[in-house]
UniProtKB/Swiss-Prot annotation:
Reaction(s) catalysed (UniProt annotation): tRNA(Pro) + L-proline + ATP = L-prolyl-tRNA(Pro) + AMP + diphosphate
SMART domains: ProRS-C_1
Domain remark from Swiss-Prot or TrEMBL: Consists of three domains: the N-terminal catalytic domain, the anticodon-binding domain and the C-terminal extension.
Cited PROSITE patterns: AA_TRNA_LIGASE_II
Source organism of this protein record: Amoebophilus asiaticus (strain 5a2)
Major subcellular site: cytoplasm
PANTHER family (UniProt xref): BIFUNCTIONAL GLUTAMATE_PROLINE--TRNA LIGASE, PROLYL-TRNA SYNTHETASE
Location within or outside the cell: Cytoplasm
Gene Ontology annotations for the cellular component aspect, listed alphabetically: aminoacyl-tRNA synthetase multienzyme complex; cytoplasm
UniProt keyword terms in alphabetical order: Aminoacyl-tRNA synthetase, ATP-binding, Cytoplasm, Ligase, Nucleotide-binding, Protein biosynthesis
GO MF annotation: an example: proline-tRNA ligase activity
UniProt protein name: Proline--tRNA ligase
NCBIfam families per record: proS_fam_I
């Protein structure tokens, strides 16, 4: 039988790690800080990729691929950018190994030292803007809307599967525009695409906002963010979109002739989402029984489990199960038939519950005789007997209902764990006893932001775009505040 999971209440961190391993999403790799994404976990990422890629292309973006290696001199061109990533950069210094004299080992060949060291891509602004210099001459070349699907390396010291690893997968968009207004509009458009993706596919209510100057992306004029609240009350930054101004254009001399015939620098944006979203799915929706997946990104939306005692029953039920599976697939429903004999139905029920499959279908002798099936929802464990001639309509409706329920549940959790405070004492009590999102006034200074973090471990998650902007006084200094910001303890 399946070993029982630790509960969320007992140890949230262990519960999270065990779900990822036992549901076969990922595992720690031989290289410290790296992970191996297993086929089931990668299938979720592929679903996310397909949905996002379609949305990007619908808004005029094209995919390209740029080198993983970046000359160190490129990073020096944008001082704020390099400062933000310097401590996380992996550096290539040599290009060849050689065998030792006894032939027992390989060592770095000292004669193969690179003239210029190469940085393993932590993000691609510098290498991409170097290309844009050659691609853009006139306003007719704008806007330039490019996306890249790739891996990046950031040498994290404290790692956690999906949430923070030395290497991870992501998409990074990089665009160039003729005007400031167009670039700002692009950054907000991509933020909204991310937020809609969260609601419509991940069933996660993302809070949209602006990062403070202290939390802003290195080299950006403005960073927009989507923040999610996990079941342990911690915040998770799920994606960001940056208005870069003309910083990278000036650093890499990316100019264009505008419609007035004058030479000007282009305006830029960059934006990205990562495999961290799989971690967000786990922590937002899953329960003490295992993974719970939103249907629209689930690799298997429905699993069919035949139940039989005799060979005669097996053949008839398998035939019916195969027929239903083919019907479901024909209607774009991802259906798996588990006809393995080495495991009993009860074992299979537990297996697919652990793996978060949205719907389980059981077909036994009585179902065959009555032309029915039994459907069980993963989110509520509710069982329903359904006539087979109505199966497509019912399954489609149930998948939508599961998505809506997961979203509503996550939204209500966020609302119930969002607190408004008016004093620093209230703030400290809320952050230590309740966690969640804390709405509080802040005076707008980095110093106050740092002091609050030092004393409570809480950071400003964002200046919200969708919350009442009434002025007040800072909870820490008593100085004037333009609006409440969202604090939280974060991953």
């Amino acid at each position: 039988m399946h070993k029982k999971l630790p509960t969320r209440a007992e140890n949230f961190s262990e519960w999270y790690n065990e779900i990822i391993k036992r549901a076969e999403l990922a595992e720690n790799a031989a290289v410290r800080g790296c992970m191996t994404i297993r086929p089931y976990g990668f299938a979720i990422w592929e679903k996310m990729q397909a949905i996002l890629d379609k949305a990007f292309k619908a808004t005029g973006h094209e995919n390209a691929y740029f080198p993983i290696f970046i000359p160190k001199s490129y990073l020096n061109r944008e001082a704020a950018h390099v400062e933000g990533f310097a401590k996380e950069c992996a550096v290539v210094t040599h290009y060849r190994l050689k065998a030792t004299e006894d032939g027992q080992q390989v060592v770095v060949d000292p004669s193969a030292k690179l003239e210029e060291e190469l940085i393993v891509r932590p993000t691609s602004e510098t290498i991409i803007w170097n290309s844009y210099k050659n691609w853009i001459q006139s306003y007719r070349d704008l806007p330039l809307l490019i996306n890249q699907w790739c891996n990046v390396v950031r040498w994290e010291m404290r790692t956690r599967l999906f949430l923070r690893t030395a290497e991870f997968l992501w998409q990074e968009g990089h665009t160039a525009h003729a005007t400031q207004a167009e670039a700002e509009q692009e950054a907000l458009q991509m933020l909204n695409i991310y937020a809609d993706f969260g609601k419509d596919y991940l069933a996660i209510p993302f809070l949209k906002g602006i990062k403070t100057e202290h939390e802003r992306f290195a080299g950006a004029e403005e960073t927009y963010t989507i923040e999610a609240l996990m079941q342990d009350g911690k915040a998770l930054q799920a994606g960001t979109s940056h208005f870069l101004g003309q910083r990278f254009a000036k650093a890499f001399e990316v100019t264009f002739t505008n419609q007035a015939g004058q030479l000007d620098y282009v305006w830029g944006t960059s934006w990205g989402l990562t495999t961290r979203l799989i971690g967000a799915l786990v922590m937002t929706h899953s329960d003490d029984k295992g993974l719970v997946l939103p249907p629209r990104v689930a690799p298997i939306q429905i699993v069919i489990i035949p139940i039989y005692r005799t060979q005669e029953e097996k053949e008839a039920i398998q035939q019916q199960a195969q027929h239903i599976q083919q019907q479901l697939i024909a209607h774009n429903i991802s259906a798996k038939l588990d006809g393995r004999d080495e495991h009993k139905p009860g074992w299979k029920f537990a297996e697919y519950e652990l793996k978060g499959v949205p719907i389980r279908m059981a077909i036994g002798p009585n179902d065959l005789a009555n032309n029915t099936v039994e459907l069980t929802r993963r989110d509520t464990s509710e069982k329903t007997t359904v006539p087979t001639d109505n199966i497509i309509v019912v399954v489609k409706s149930m998948l939508d209902s599961i998505h809506d329920n997961l979203y509503q549940r996550a939204y209500e959790f966020r609302e119930q764990n969002t607190y408004q405070v008016n004093s620093y004492e209230e703030f400290k009590t809320a952050i230590s006893q309740k966690r969640g999102f804390i709405l509080a006034h802040w005076d707008g200074t980095k110093e106050t932001e740092r002091q609050i973090h030092a004393e409570t471990k809480a950071t400003i998650r964002c200046i919200p775009l969708e919350v009442n902007t009434e002025p007040g006084v800072c909870i820490y200094t008593g100085k004037p505040s333009k609006q409440r910001v969202v604090f939280g303890q974060a991953y």
